[in-house]
Amino acid sequence: LYELCVYLAEQSNSAKEESTQTNPVPFSTVSKDAKKAFKKIQKQYPVLRYSTGRAKPVLASHLMSYTGIVGIYVPFTVEANVNTDIADYNHPFDTCHELAHLHGFMRENEANFIAYLACIQSDDAYFRYSGYMTALIYATNALYDEDTKLYMQISALLSDEVHADLHEEDIYWEKIRTTKAYQTVETASDKVNDTYLKINGQSDGVKSYGKILDLLLAEYFAR
């Protein structure tokens, strides 16, 4: 796990340095580039060819943050919806995650992993950064639970620019989570989301989001 974290930290630093993105990218651009990212990996993964949909921004994204949800796929309308109020670097990964649902991958860990693959193989450093950073957060959260000293070693590897992005996101969620609205809505929303996932065949419910780590480890050591 530590070795994977080192790799993801180094890749996050490199992608951040390579990225020319300084201002928030319009979601219409992110959506188009996400489709390009999927198209690029279709030769390697032909099963990802069968979808004509695209991701859409949630108009009330700030309100959606009070539910703790950053994206949702609605099977009844075949729509992928993304919360665009959160830190900008999340948008490519979250968009690709919802597109993975459009391609028929309903399990959250699988959608996360497909989003990771689409992002890190993109020609756009902004997308690669989003993929590596999201994976890094999953991996370091697990590492923190196992060994806080090793976690701090990984933190020390991150560039000032990467730390700045993480700090920005922490501030955003801290403001959201300290409100009474969040404490009330998020609890109910979490139960609804958990039930929704279980109804759709994911017996682990919201816990399935974190299972991406098993796939990340398998992919890393298969290199």
Predicted regions, residues:
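Internal, well-ordered alpha/beta segment that forms a basic, Gly-enriched binding/recognition surface
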Residues: 1-16
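Auxiliary, metal-adjacent structural segments of Zn-dependent hydrolase domains
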Residues: 12-84, 88
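Generic structural signal for hydrophobic core residues of well-folded globular domains
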Residues: 86, 99, 103, 118, ...
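Active-site recognition of the HExxH zinc-binding catalytic motif
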Residues: 93-112, 116-117
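Active-site/pore-lining binding-face segments in mid-to-C-terminal subdomains
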Residues: 113-165
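Pan-zinc metallopeptidase signature
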Residues: 163-223
